[in-house]
Amino acid sequence: METLTLNPRHARLTVTPAPDARNSLVLWHQTVSPLKVLRNGALILLARHSPSLAFKRWLYRCIGMKVGTHASLAWQVTPDLFFPELIEVGENSIIGYNTTILAHEYLLHEWRIGPVKIGRDVTIGANCTLLPGIVIGDGAMISAMSLVNKDVPPGARVGGVPVRTLVPNQLFS
C-alpha cells in the first residue's frame, strides 16, 4: 500500500468543490465581488507599470497586501487579483520581473484559496510563479522561471519547475 505525503501548503488551503458539472472558474463571481476585482485590477495595472518602488508598495497596500519596509517588487510583478489581502511580503525582499503571486487556483471540480507568506530578505528571480498556501522562509533565494509549489525553508537555494534544492553553482547562473 502506497503512502502519500501531503504537501504542507495543502493544509493552508480552503478547498471548495464546484457545485455542479461546470468548471470552477465559470463561477468566479461567487467567490469574489466583481467590483473588488475591477478595483484591484486597476490598481495592480498601475503598480505593474510604475517605476517607483515606494508608489508600488503603497498601491499594493491599498489592495490589502502586507508589504514590508524596503520590499522591492520589480516591473510587471502580478499579485493575486481576487485575494491580494492573503499575500505578505517581508521586509527587504526582492521579487523579480514578471513574477506572479497566486492566492487562489481554480481547478476543474474545485477552487482553492490560501495565504502566501514571503519572509524577510528573500530573493525571487524573474518570471516565477508562486502558488497559494506557500511559505518562503527568511533569506531564501529562488532562481528565475521557477514554479514554487511547496514551502521553501529559511536560507534555502531553490529553482526549477517545480522547485527543488539547487547546488551553489546552479543558482542564478
Model-derived regions: residue spans:
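Structural signal for interior beta-strand "rungs" in well-ordered beta-sheet cores
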Residues: 66-67, 71-166
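Terminal amphipathic alpha-helical/low-complexity segments used for targeting or macromolecular assembly
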Residues: 1-65, 139, 161-173
